């Protein structure tokens, strides 16, 4: 049941890791395909590195990925390794986007408080809540997802260090985020609060929004769902299309998710309307920005969710980046990452307080 964890963890790490190098001798490749009577397609496709992305992104996509799975690690070892990476990546982000970072506890929940060096008076009365990625098992984004946005928006970001699977399955992470949101409502008008997340945090952002509605709480001013999905019962076509589950942008043997989500979902029905918001009523949800990319395993999940929001009458925007993999903005040095972060910041600047 740990497969989805590994997928989502590598998702956050792939864009910033140094790829293992293997034999890169040029080989002749051709397209071929076979389609069965039931519509199942077996496709071998030549996918060159596109010229439509930045030179930095081209270099990332051109690197060869090792087939070696590597040794298995315990959840404790996995978390320790990811924590070390997140600390280092956070320092890189702070060099590009200077902020102050402090540990705190809000409503009994540990958080990181990421504060701009200067907050202008008109932005003092607003706050953003980040729900980090990491496959519901590790923290692969509380710094890298929060630092750029705090700097660019000039707004304090509270990154929720929610309880994680497998020790704490659904709805623990939702409950922790709701507790922080309720506490924010004691200080900030709901229209001045935004919630956003990447990957697992994007799933959670939708779930938290559904829970806010179920509880009858006032909706936040805006949400951001970045490389996410809203239905645990349906994987979507891009899961089967992209290799390494669309984490690196390379193609490989397709993987499916299903039982791999079990550590987080636990005994909850995959069609539960909080676990899978698309199974419920989305009317009244706040303005939402969706961001994905064409080699993201959750391209389908993100676009399906965007259309569901539109059908429900929600003010929903979708941005799809060319050729890049899942959660590529975790590499803060890519020009496309800077563009994505700027889009996120502009969206919250536009909608908070309205």
List the predicted regions and their residue ranges:
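Bacterial N-terminal signal peptides
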Residues: 7-16
């Amino acid at each position: 049941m740990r497969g989805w964890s590994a997928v989502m963890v590598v998702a956050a790490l792939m864009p910033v890791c140094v790829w293992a190098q293997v034999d890169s001798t040029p080989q002749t490749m051709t397209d071929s395909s076979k389609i069965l009577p039931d519509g199942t397609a077996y496709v071998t496709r030549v996918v060159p590195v596109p010229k439509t992305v930045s030179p930095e992104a081209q270099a990332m996509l051109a690197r060869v990925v090792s087939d070696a799975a590597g040794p298995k690690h315990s959840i404790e070892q996995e978390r320790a390794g990811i924590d070390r990476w997140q600390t280092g990546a956070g320092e890189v982000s702070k060099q590009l986007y200077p902020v102050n970072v402090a540990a705190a506890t809000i409503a009994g929940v540990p958080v990181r408080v990421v504060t701009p060096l200067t907050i202008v008076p008109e932005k003092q009365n607003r706050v953003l809540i980040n729900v980090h990625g990491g496959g519901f098992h590790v923290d692969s984004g509380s710094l890298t997802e929060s630092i750029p946005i705090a700097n660019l928006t000039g707004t304090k970001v509270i990154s929720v260090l929610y309880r994680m699977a497998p020790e704490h399955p659904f709805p623990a992470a939702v409950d922790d985020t709701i507790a922080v949101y309720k506490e924010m409502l004691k200080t900030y008008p709901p229209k001045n609060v935004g919630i956003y997340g990447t990957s697992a945090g994007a799933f959670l952002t939708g779930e938290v929004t559904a829970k806010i509605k179920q509880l009858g709480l006032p909706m936040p001013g805006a949400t951001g769902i970045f490389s996410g999905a809203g239905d645990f019962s349906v994987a979507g076509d891009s899961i089967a299309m992209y290799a390494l589950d669309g984490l690196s942008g390379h193609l490989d043997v397709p993987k499916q998710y299903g039982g791999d989500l079990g550590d987080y979902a636990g005994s909850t029905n995959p069609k539960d309307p909080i676990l899978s918001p698309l199974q419920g009523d989305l009317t009244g949800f706040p303005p939402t920005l969706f961001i994905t990319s064409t080699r993201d395993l959750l391209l389908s999940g993100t676009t399906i969710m965007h259309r569901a929001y539109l059908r429900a009458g929600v003010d929903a925007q979708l941005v799809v980046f060319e050729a890049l993999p899942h959660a590529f903005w975790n590499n803060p040095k890519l020009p496309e990452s800077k563009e994505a972060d700027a889009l996120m910041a502009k969206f919250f600047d536009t909608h908070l307080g309205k």
